[in-house]
Amino acid sequence: MPVNIRIPTPLRKLTHDEEVVETSAENIGQAIADLEARYPGIQERLLDESGEVRRFVNVYVNEEDIRFLDNKDTAIKDGDEVSIIPAIAGG
């Protein structure tokens, strides 16, 4: 059973409208690299110039924010669900 990555609506144009993408990556960094290999351009939407997750992008593994875990080194395993959630500003 692979890891499922839930793709937010604004990024689905890069994943050919796929809402859920499967990966066999072992951590978040590898999962993002896997997404980039399959869907060029998605990584620049998720990572900043220093290679860290952009501050307005939230990534969760089984509903836990990776910023409170090991960031991109957060381990993932078969059956986990990764959610990418862009922050929304308003006013």
Predicted regions and their residues:
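Ubiquitin-like/PB1-type beta-grasp interaction modules and other compact soluble beta-rich domains
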Residues: 1-90
